[in-house]
């Protein structure tokens, strides 16, 4: 009977330890994506200036020219991807 109590206590202590380790690693992992996303989407000043000078995808191109890689749709007056089937 003593062995059963000791094994139950050790099992319970092991589960508590496993929970604590998992919780600690999960809290560290939550910070990692935030740091990674902020570094990915960090924009330098040159890119911001280029962004203001041209219109991006599905933006009006009446007054602004489309950014590189896009063409102005003659029908809708939006910047779209160039494709052979477009008029």
From Swiss-Prot:
Expressed by the venom gland. It is found in: Secreted. Residues 25-52 form a propeptide. The presence of a 'disulfide through disulfide knot' structurally defines this protein as a knottin. Coiled coil: none annotated. Disulfide bonds join 54-67, 61-72, 66-79. Keywords: Disulfide bond, Ion channel impairing toxin, Knottin, Secreted, Signal, Toxin. Its main location: secreted. The keyword Signal applies. Ion channel inhibitor. This is U3-theraphotoxin-Hhn1a 2. Belongs to the neurotoxin 10 (Hwtx-1) family. 51 (Hntx-8) subfamily. Hntx-8 sub-subfamily. It comes from the Eukaryota. InterPro entries: Huwentoxin-1, Huwentoxin_CS1. Residues 1-24 form the signal peptide. One of its GO terms (molecular function) is ion channel inhibitor activity. GO terms for cellular component: extracellular region. The keyword Secreted applies.
């Amino acid at each position: 009977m003593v062995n059963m109590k000791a094994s139950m206590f050790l099992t319970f202590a092991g589960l508590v330890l496993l929970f604590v380790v998992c919780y600690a690693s999960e809290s560290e992992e939550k910070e990692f994506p935030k740091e990674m996303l902020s570094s990915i989407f960090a924009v330098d000043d040159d890119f911001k200036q280029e962004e203001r000078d041209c219109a991006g995808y599905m933006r009006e191109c009446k007054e602004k020219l489309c950014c590189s890689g896009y063409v102005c749709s003659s029908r809708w007056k939006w910047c779209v991807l160039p494709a052979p089937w477009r008029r």
